[in-house]
């Protein structure tokens, strides 16, 4: 009753009144227990299972057509559903069912301009959070997702199409992205087209381009061509594919070919003598403009314009990839790359599996990740990364045995996997991969079992440096002769090292960091094959076990590692003239026990992804 304190009843222990159960009523704050009564403990609880289980039950209700309050009519298909689920997932349906539209009161709603199967897949996603995008459905799924404003599915479709990019289909994907306002996909397809123009211009899609799209492409300063002759030849091939229809469009298109950049011989002998060019006044004017530019160098400052601007040169450089490893107590699948030209670390596509202790090397400009440990299991699977498409593929044959802490290198067109451990024992097994046959073959085993071994190739030989035999770190080194299929012992290092970094620099093998019996190491040494001797090199600034070592654009770089306390995301660059290591930061992840590889890429390639 308003204005009066509430009564509260509390249980009295048996024996207080001679009754088993009774009540004692008090007046006061209903949220406060009487003195002497302990306050209850609190235990907040959040269920991880609840959302999934709830969705599963609601989906069962849908399948049994129970509690459904709307039927979507798509073509000849009727799809039973719940308005609240559709509204929660799709702004399109939320506007439809919560506004004043007629559909908000209808039990059957007709949805037009959408594929039946695509709608089924999207409704399934609303109830299950799962969908499979594939080549057979992406072209109907993306427009449907756009209509229903399902941003997540739009992104998934665009990501799928990015992975399918090829010189034969990039123009179609570009047009598809433009139609459906997928800006990121359009940007990627544009970059891909520009970089691969020499192959794209030979495709059927190129010949079918409308004039406005052709102009968009050839107008780009980023077009990857050896000379402007290729652009002219591409335009003339396009015109002659359908001469009668396209001849009137030639002057408009030719304006975007940079004729002043052609050689005089090609301009006069090929362009000026072409019958289609000669027969059109506007085309002849463009040729005359180019001739004047070439013949009157003193007038060139007054003649500058889009047609005289050189296309940006395609620069080549090496890019460093850091793959997998151990971070924050777990194996990781992430991959990042370092471009020395921009001094930037950027994330790229992750591997399909988490891998620490992974062996990494580059064969035919493709990055291979071999074996490793995913945090619970030892792996024999292999993945391959293509930097041109930013994709990992798992269609590489597995090694014959599971391996982590394995050394991997390329010699004579083969990928070698050396040593490691399989979860039972330390290995001396060596096998090599033939990319043409997609097959691994055993070769001669090392004389010593080695995990955490570093490998390098120099002078046609494969070197296995240090590691551990399963009991203690090693300073021994073996060299494999592929002609003899034999391993030979050579001079040992000055320091025992496992999980070290190794690379060939200035015709010598450098071994850095790692761990000995007691601690992580910052020391470094190098091997001279001419004298069969190891000699000390100035130590790095940081101790680094699980360090990666690579040569990038002529610079020796030590990447990541563990200093005994902290996982590192720094790199050090060796300066042989000053005999010092210079420390740099910038990696996205602190990493231990991953792999590194170096791929030569054009400037354009390195900026597509």
Curated annotation (Swiss-Prot):
Subcellular location: Cytoplasm, Perinuclear region; Nucleus; Golgi apparatus, trans-Golgi network; Cell projection, Axon
GO CC term (a single one): cytoplasm
CDD domains: BACK_KLHL20 (cd18459), BTB_POZ_KLHL20_KLEIP (cd18249)
Database matches in InterPro entries: BACK (IPR011705), BTB-kelch_protein (IPR017096), BTB/POZ_dom (IPR000210), Kelch-typ_b-propeller (IPR015915), Kelch_1 (IPR006652), SKP1/BTB/POZ_sf (IPR011333)
Single GO BP term: protein ubiquitination
Keyword Cytoplasm: yes
Domain BTB: 68-135
PROSITE patterns: BTB
Keywords: Actin-binding, Cell projection, Cytoplasm, Golgi apparatus, Kelch repeat, Nucleus, Protein transport, Repeat, Transport, Ubl conjugation pathway
Pfam families: BACK, BTB, Kelch_1, Kelch_KLHDC2_KLHL20_DRC7
Annotated GO MF terms: actin binding; type II interferon binding
Location of the BACK domain: 170-272
Annotated pathway: Protein modification; protein ubiquitination
Name of the protein this chain belongs to: Kelch-like protein 20
Species the sequence originates in: Pongo abelii
Lineage: Eukaryota, Metazoa, Chordata, Craniata, Vertebrata
């Amino acid at each position: 009753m308003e204005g009066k304190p509430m009564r509260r009843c509390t249980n009295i222990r048996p024996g207080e009144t001679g009754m088993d159960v009774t009540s004692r009523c008090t007046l006061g704050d209903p949220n406060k227990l009487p003195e002497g009564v302990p306050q209850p403990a609190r235990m907040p609880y959040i269920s991880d299972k609840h959302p999934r289980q709830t969705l599963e039950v609601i989906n069962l209700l849908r399948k049994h057509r129970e509690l459904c309050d709307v039927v979507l009519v798509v073509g000849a298909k009727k799809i039973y559903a719940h308005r609240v689920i559709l509204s929660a997932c799709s702004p399109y349906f939320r506007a439809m069912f919560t506004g004043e539209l007629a559909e908000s009161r209808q039990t059957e709603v007709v949805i037009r301009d959408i594929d039946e199967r695509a709608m089924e897949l999207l409704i399934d996603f609303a109830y299950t959070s799962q969908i499979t995008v594939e080549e057979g459905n992406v072209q109907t799924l993306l427009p449907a997702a756009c209509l229903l404003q399902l941003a997540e599915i739009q992104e998934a479709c665009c990501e799928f199409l990015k992975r399918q990019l090829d010189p034969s289909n990039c123009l179609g994907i570009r047009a598809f992205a433009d139609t459906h306002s997928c800006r990121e996909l359009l940007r990627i397809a544009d970059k891909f087209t520009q970089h691969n123009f020499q192959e794209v211009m030979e495709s059927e899609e190129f010949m079918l381009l409308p004039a406005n799209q052709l102009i968009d492409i050839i107008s780009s300063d980023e077009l990857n061509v050896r000379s402007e002759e290729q652009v002219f030849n591409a335009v003339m091939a396009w015109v002659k594919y359908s001469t009668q229809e396209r001849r009137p469009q030639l002057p408009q298109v030719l304006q975007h070919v940079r004729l002043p950049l052609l050689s005089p011989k090609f301009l006069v002998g090929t362009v000026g003598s072409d019958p289609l060019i000669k027969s059109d006044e506007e085309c002849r004017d463009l040729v005359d403009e180019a001739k004047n530019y070439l013949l009157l160098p003193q007038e060139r400052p007054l003649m500058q314009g889009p047609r005289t601007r050189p296309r940006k040169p395609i620069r080549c450089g090496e890019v460093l990839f850091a793959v997998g490893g151990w971070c924050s107590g777990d194996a990781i699948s992430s991959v990042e790359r370092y471009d020395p030209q921009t001094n930037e670390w950027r994330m790229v596509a992750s591997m399909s599996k988490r891998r620490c202790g992974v062996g990494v090397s580059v064969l035919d400009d493709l990055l291979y990740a071999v074996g490793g440990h995913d945090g619970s299991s030892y792996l024999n699977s292999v993945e391959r990364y293509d930097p041109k498409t930013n994709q990992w593929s798992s269609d590489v044959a597995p090694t014959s045995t599971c391996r982590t802490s394995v050394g991997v290198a390329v010699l004579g067109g083969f990928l070698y996997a050396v040593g490691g451990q399989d979860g039972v024992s330390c290995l001396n097994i060596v096998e090599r991969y033939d990319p043409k046959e997609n097959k691994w073959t055993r070769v001669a085993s090392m004389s010593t079992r080695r995990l955490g071994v570093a490998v390098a190739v120099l002078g046609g030989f494969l070197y296995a440096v240090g590691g551990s035999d399963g009991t203690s770190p090693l300073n021994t080194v073996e060299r494999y002769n592929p002609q003899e299929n034999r391993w030979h012992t050579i001079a040992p290092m000055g320091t025992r090292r496992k999980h070290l970094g190794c690379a060939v620099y200035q015709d010598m093998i450098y071994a850095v960091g790692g761990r000995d019996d007691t601690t992580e190491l910052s020391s470094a040494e190098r091997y001279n094959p001419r004298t069969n001797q190891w000699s000390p090199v100035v130590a790095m600034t940081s101790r680094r076990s699980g360090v990666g070592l690579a040569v990038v654009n002529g610079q020796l770089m030590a990447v990541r590692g563990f200093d005994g306390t902290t996982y590192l995301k720094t790199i050090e660059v060796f300066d042989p003239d000053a005999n010092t290591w210079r420390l740099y930061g910038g990696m996205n992840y602190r990493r231990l026990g991953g792999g590194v590889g170096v791929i030569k890429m054009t400037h354009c390639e390195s900026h597509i992804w």
